[in-house]
């Protein structure tokens, strides 16, 4: 064909601008609770997108692309603003009547109708003489039918004529008939078989005939252009004639000349009718009044019909001649002719197929309101994120488990160190250096100078001796004062009324006795420290000599040098043939060399597999991290129960990563098993097994030696801690002794002054009275003095019991307390408190003679009857004796009860018990001793949790 058959295009709908921004802002503020101003740019983009699609474009591909984009954005917009109300004005494509609705569905249907119009125009303008143009025309006509089909299936209530089901259905029929026409043209152009062309032409004629019948129902309604009907009628007869013509050609080729002649007559008759209509159509067609048809539609159609009429006429005349002269076949009737088969028509291209194209997806671009995600989509996305997290956790757990198995297996097999040792055995490059443990190296750095320990031990002995000497001197001072008092009493009986010093010094003697007892226990702890130091001194000296000497000693031990090894190492543990390692045989060397190569190769493979596995896991994590299905969830928001299937299909994207991880884990386990078998095979060798045995013995000896050194280091730390605590104890005890000395001196000085005053008063009265002591009294006094001189003081009283105070109760000052005793007379102290710990400072809270007396304390009242031990006369209170001198001033004892300040300990707490007589301190936690202290044989620390020693011993630190 030299002329192209005209095609009908769908008329275009028209519209005016709408306001998208205001309704969208209202919905964002009301439904999403966000700031509408933050989406001003998105609203402007949507507004421009509509203007470009419906106003600025023509009938070219650019217009089609803009409409594709706008409709795609409408689909996404409806997922977020389904109930939005915007006024959409559209003019009817056939009646030009304005229709305005606020539904998004009306806007979408109008845009699809406009897309179908653009597609039909593209099909109409395509050059079908070119194969590519013919394909585009065929595709666009089918796509137009698909768009119109979507309108009929999804928009049931048409607000305008052009969107009504009947009109849309007719347009679909026209588009499908034109698609069949284009396909028939393609078959003719490609010179396909006559029977195939006949079937296609018959199908096209049938479709045009059906459309003509449908269009006749709209006659007089002013919907369709009447020129459409002329074109459709002409084409129906034209393709009917073509079908008969090509069928006749097929029958003639099959030898059915009579049937072929009848069909040619039918074809000629149909084309003659079409030619008459085409001739009249030329005079009635006005191109300007029918923009949906090409401007040359009448002429082109007339030329096509005329050309086919000529062909049919010539073919009929030739067939008549041939039949009359040659074939002489009887011509069958037209009714008896078999019907021509119809070629099944092509299906319309659906809108899903159009938008499923990657190029169309790119045209649509990203969602304009991508930042605005509905809450339901957020919830579904969270569920999907949790599914992804489960997948990642499962894979990570598998990888970590596999890595743990690999690491444990390598540690169990001692790889790769074991392979290096095999290589050393082969090369004879055995390392005689003995590796020392990190704990032992740290111990060497912490030992320091041991001479300080010896100095501290000597200082400890000196402090203890000085404290004991001073305590005994104080006891002697109290004894001397008591003897002097009794001597004066015997001499001046009965006028000597000074109270006995025994009750007043009971508390002082109790404190002195308790401190002496604690000092005895401390001496035991000091002896224990000295003994412990002597037992570990060789080991500590070795540790303090430095790392180089320590390594040298370790080598001496492993080499079995009896002159150099540590005395703590048993010579029975050393092998006389340690140095002479048994050489491997040649066969074992070859096997070992092969094992070294195999082991290295397997370790390299294992390393690569682990690296690849970790890299795949990282890629999986990154892929899952960047995966986002919010858009898919938004697109499938209207579907019910789609999430499980959607999630399952999306998670399948990560299946390749899971497969690679599983393969890596399986390969690593296989290599680990091979390494295990390799090590076991090497260890089965006789020579190698003997070497391993000796190496194990060597390591055992070194470990035992290190263990003994470490235990010595722990004991050294205990000694240093005990020395610090012991010296601190003696410092505290020295302060307590100093306070006791001051109290004893104050007490003896006061008593001596009181005696001098009393003796002076007695002698003055005797001189004034001219009397002298009776002979019996003198004799008695002399006898008493002799007995006192021979009297040996007993041991001081026992320390006070727990829970009692060591503070004696002094009488109140004159005028405020009882008047029947002197101010220097003190009641007996409470029962002594037994000492549970020699360094327990709790007994210093109420230190004896330093406390202010309590008025409620019991007072001693001497009986009025003569006493055999001291006086022979009744006691005369000082207030009733005019010759008795005024009582001496009351000693200025410390108030509140004496509690000397303790020096702060290093850690703020002292586990040592303070000396007896010291103020009680809050009980401090006792630190448990290390486990090896209880297991150490050969010595045991005294006083650990027991009485005596330095308050539980020096071991508690």
From Swiss-Prot:
One of its GO terms (biological process) is protein transport to vacuole involved in ubiquitin-dependent protein catabolic process via the multivesicular body sorting pathway. Residues 449-493, 585-626 form a coiled coil. Its main location: cytoplasm. Residues 6-406 form the BRO1 domain. The gene is BRO1. Residues 751-766 have a biased composition (Basic and acidic residues). This is Vacuolar protein-sorting protein BRO1. Pfam families: ALIX_LYPXL_bnd (PF13949), BRO1 (PF03097). Disulfide bonds: none annotated.
């Amino acid at each position: 064909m030299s002329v192209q058959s005209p095609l009908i295009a769908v008329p275009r709908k028209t519209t005016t601008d709408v306001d998208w921004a205001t309704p969208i802002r209202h919905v964002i503020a009301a439904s999403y609770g966000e700031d509408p101003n933050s989406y001003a740019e998105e609203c402007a983009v949507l507004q421009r997108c509509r203007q470009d699609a419906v106003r600025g474009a023509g009938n070219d591909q650019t217009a089609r692309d803009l409409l594709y984009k706008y409709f795609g954005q409408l689909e996404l917009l409806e997922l977020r603003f389904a109930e939005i109300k915007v006024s959409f004005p559209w003019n009817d494509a056939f009646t030009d009547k304005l229709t305005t609705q606020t539904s998004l569905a009306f806007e979408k249907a109008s845009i699809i109708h406009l897309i179908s119009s653009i597609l039909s125009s593209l099909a109409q303008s395509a050059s079908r003489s070119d194969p590519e143009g013919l394909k585009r025309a065929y595709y666009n006509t089918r796509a137009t039918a698909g768009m119109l089909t979507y309108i009929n299936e999804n928009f049931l209530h048409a607000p305008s004529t052009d969107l009504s089901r009947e009109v849309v259905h007719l347009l679909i029929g026209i588009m499908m008939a034109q698609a069949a026409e284009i396909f028939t043209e393609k078959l003719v152009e490609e010179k396909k078989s006559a029977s195939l062309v006949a079937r296609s032409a018959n199908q096209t004629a049938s479709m045009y005939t059906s459309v003509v019948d449908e269009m006749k129902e709209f006659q007089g309604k002013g919907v369709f252009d009447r020129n459409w009907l002329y074109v459709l009628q002409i084409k129906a007869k034209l393709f009917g004639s073509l079908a008969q013509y090509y069928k006749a050609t097929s029958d003639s080729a099959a030898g059915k000349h009579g049937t072929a002649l009848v069909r040619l007559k039918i074809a000629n008759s149909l084309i003659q009718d079409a030619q008459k209509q085409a001739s009249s159509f030329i005079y009635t067609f006005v191109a300007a009044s029918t923009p949906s048809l090409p401007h040359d539609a009448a002429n082109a159609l007339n030329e096509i019909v005329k050309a086919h009429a000529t062909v049919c006429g010539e073919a009929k005349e030739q067939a008549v001649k041939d039949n009359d002269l040659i074939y002489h076949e009887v011509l069958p009737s037209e009714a008896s002719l078999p019907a021509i088969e119809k070629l099944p028509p092509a299906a319309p291209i659906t809108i899903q197929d159009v938008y499923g194209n990657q190029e169309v997806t790119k045209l649509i671009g990203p969602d304009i309101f991508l930042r605005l995600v509905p809450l339901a989509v957020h919830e579904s996305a969270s569920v999907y994120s949790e599914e992804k997290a489960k997948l990642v956790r499962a894979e990570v757990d598998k990888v970590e488990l596999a890595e743990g198995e690999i690491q444990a297996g390598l540690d169990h097999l001692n790889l790769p160190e074991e392979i290096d040792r095999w290589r050393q055995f082969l090369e004879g490059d055995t390392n005689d250096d003995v590796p020392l443990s990190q704990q032992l190296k740290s111990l060497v750095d912490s030992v320091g100078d041991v001479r300080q320990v010896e100095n501290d031990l000597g200082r400890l002995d000196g402090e203890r001796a000085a404290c004991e000497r001073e305590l005994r001197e104080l006891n002697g001072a109290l004894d001397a004062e008591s003897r002097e008092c009794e001597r004066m009493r015997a001499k001046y009986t009965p006028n000597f009324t000074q109270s006995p010093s025994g009750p007043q010094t009971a508390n002082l003697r109790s404190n002195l006795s308790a401190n002496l007892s604690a000092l005895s226990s401390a001496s035991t702890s000091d002896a224990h420290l000295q003994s412990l130091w002597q037992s570990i001194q060789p080991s500590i000296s070795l540790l303090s000599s430095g790392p180089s000497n320590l390594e040298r000693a370790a080598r001496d031990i492993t080499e079995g040098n009896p002159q150099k090894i540590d005395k703590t190492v048993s010579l029975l543990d050393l092998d006389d043939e340690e140095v002479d390692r048994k050489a491997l045989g040649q066969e074992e060397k070859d096997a070992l060399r092969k094992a070294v190569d195999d082991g290295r190769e397997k370790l390299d493979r294992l390393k690569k597999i682990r690296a690849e596995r970790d890299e795949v896991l990282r890629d999986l994590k990154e892929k899952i991290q960047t995966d986002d299905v919010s858009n898919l969830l938004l697109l499938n928001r209207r579907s019910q129960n789609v999430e499980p299937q959607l999630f399952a299909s999306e998670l399948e994207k990560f299946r390749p990563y899971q497969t690679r991880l599983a393969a890596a884990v399986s390969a690593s386990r296989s290599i680990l098993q091979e390494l295990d078998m390799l090590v076991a095979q090497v260890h089965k060798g006789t020579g190698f097994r003997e070497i391993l045995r000796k190496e194990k013995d060597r390591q055992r000896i070194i470990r035992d030696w290190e263990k003994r050194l470490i235990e010595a280091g722990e004991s050294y730390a205990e000694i240093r801690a005990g020395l610090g605590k012991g010296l601190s104890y003696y410092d505290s005890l020295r302060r307590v002794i100093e306070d006791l000395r001051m109290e004893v001196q104050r007490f003896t000085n006061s008593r001596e002054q009181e005696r001098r005053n009393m003796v002076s008063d007695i002698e003055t009265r005797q001189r004034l009275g001219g009397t002298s002591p009776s002979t019996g009294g003198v004799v008695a006094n002399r006898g008493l003095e002799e007995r006192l001189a021979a009297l040996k003081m007993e041991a001081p009283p026992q320390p006070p019991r727990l829970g009692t105070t060591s503070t004696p109760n002094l009488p109140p000052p004159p005028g405020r307390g009882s008047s029947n005793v002197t101010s220097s007379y003190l009641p007996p102290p409470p029962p002594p408190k037994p000492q549970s710990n020699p360094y327990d400072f709790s007994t210093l809270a109420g230190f004896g003679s330093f406390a202010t007396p309590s008025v409620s304390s019991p007072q001693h009242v001497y009986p009025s009857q003569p006493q055999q031990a001291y006086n022979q006369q009744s006691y005369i209170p000082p207030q009733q004796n005019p010759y008795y001198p005024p009582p001496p001033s009351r000693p200025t004892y410390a108030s509140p009860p004496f509690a000397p300040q303790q020096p702060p300990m290093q850690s703020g707490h002292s586990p040592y018990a303070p000396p007896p007589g010291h103020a009680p301190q809050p009980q401090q936690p006792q630190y448990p001793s290390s486990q090896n202290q209880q297991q150490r044989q050969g010595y045991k620390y005294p006083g650990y949790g027991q009485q005596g020693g330095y308050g539980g011993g020096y071991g508690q630190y």
